[in-house]
């Protein structure tokens, strides 16, 4: 399917090695994009920035491992915030996926503000990378 993209989410309930193997198998079967997730496997014990990092750590680890194993783009999702989105890119993800960061809000203006914050955070990584 040359003009149709297929994105497949690798379940976080698998071990990291099993996630990598599944991602490789999915790409071999025709998946064009692999998405990681963290699900409920991480329960932050801290608040603030440290809590955001704790929450996203399973999906960040999966993005790192999978992006080094497959030749297709990897999207990092679950627990992604303006703090952790740059970490996802540094881990090897081609981009991020957000859901609850947006849909938990009741105000469309706040939803747009969250997306703008994510874009700004990721652009700062690209600017820093280009400066090196």
Regions inferred by a protein language model and the residue ranges of each:
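Alpha/beta enzyme core
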Residues: 1-76, 81-132
């Amino acid at each position: 399917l040359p003009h149709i993209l297929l994105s497949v989410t690798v379940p976080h309930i698998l071990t990291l090695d099993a996630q990598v193997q599944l991602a490789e198998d999915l790409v071999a079967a025709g998946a064009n994009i692999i998405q990681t997730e963290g699900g409920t496997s991480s329960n932050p014990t801290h608040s603030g920035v440290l809590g955001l990092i704790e929450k996203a750590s399973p999906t960040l680890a999966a993005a790192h491992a999978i992006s080094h194993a497959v030749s297709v783009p990897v999207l990092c999702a679950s627990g992604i915030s303006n703090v952790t989105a740059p970490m996802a890119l540094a881990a090897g993800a081609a981009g991020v996926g957000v859901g609850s960061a947006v849909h938990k809000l009741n105000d469309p203006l706040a939803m747009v503000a969250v997306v703008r914050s994510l874009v700004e955070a990721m652009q700062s990584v690209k600017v820093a990378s280009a400066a090196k």
